[in-house]
Design a protein with these regions (language model features):
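N-terminal signal-anchor transmembrane alpha helix
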Residues: 17-55, 229
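Helix-loop junctions at the membrane-solvent interface of multi-pass transporters
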Residues: 38-39, 64, 111, 134
Length: 238
């Protein structure tokens, strides 16, 4: 059985025929993505995956600029923290949290449309396993393990002809999840100001002197560009 799982995982890195979807099927996939972000019981779990991508956005941005990532914590309330040290660009590190799910989402959408949806899922498993090296709390271990199992099941147990559709739905859900998290961040700056200390926009404003609304707008702009990119990729299949 393990041998079969391994073969399925390795075969996941091969290309399949590009997706060609009727508009009705795209609508169903979009509805499924919206359900992951709007139905409370589904968001309770999918939101934690969005948080993982958020924190990995910080981590990859830091590593790309020469910082050393010292740890990632994940919490059941969908909170998280990524710490890094070094001479890297702290502003770049701090920026790429909220836009990260949307950036990964448009990547998933584009990959699925070009026949690389199952490869995106297999690559996600690899990234999640490597993330264990940086997790620094027990809750984070269980949250990450749950994500690995969930994506792993999609890789080894779902027929290859369906994996591209699931990757597309996951990509759309990540973009919608980024929008939901951004809106939640806006509420921190308007009606829940007691939580300002945990806001990436607030932290960036303190570091740079650039007002927090500018950072909120910048997050929204990147998320919007990713959504537009996903729409353009989808139009190829319509």
């Amino acid at each position: 059985m393990v041998h079969d799982w391994w073969n399925a995982f390795v075969e996941g890195f091969t290309r399949t025929p590009p997706l060609s979807l009727p508009a009705a099927e795209v609508a169903w996939l979009l509805a499924a993505a919206a359900a992951l972000c709007l139905v409370p019981v589904l968001w309770r779990f999918f939101g934690r995956f969005v948080t993982i991508v958020h924190e990995l956005g910080h981590a990859f941005a830091g590593l790309a600029t020469g910082m050393r990532v010292t740890g990632i914590t994940l919490r059941r309330d969908q909170g998280g923290t990524t710490l890094g040290v070094g001479r890297g660009r702290a502003v770049w590190f701090g920026f790429w949290g909220y836009p990260a799910p949307a950036a990964v989402g448009v990547g998933f959408v584009a990959a699925s449309m070009q026949g690389w949806g199952r490869a995106a899922l297999s690559a996600t498993v690899v990234v999640l396993v490597l993330t264990f090296l940086f997790i620094r709390n027990l809750q984070g271990v269980f949250i990450l393990l749950g994500a690995i199992v969930a994506v792993g099941v999609l890789v080894v147990a779902v027929p290859s002809e369906v994996q591209g559709h699931l990757t597309l739905a996951a990509g759309l859900a990540l973009i919608l999840g980024a929008v939901r998290d951004w809106w939640n961040l806006v509420s921190v700056h308007t009606t829940r100001r007691r939580e300002l200390g945990s806001s990436d926009a607030f932290i960036l404003a303190r570091r740079t002197g650039v007002p927090a609304p500018v950072w909120l707008g910048s997050f929204a702009a990147v998320i919007g560009l990713c959504a537009a990119g996903a729409w353009l990729a989808l139009r190829v299949a319509l």
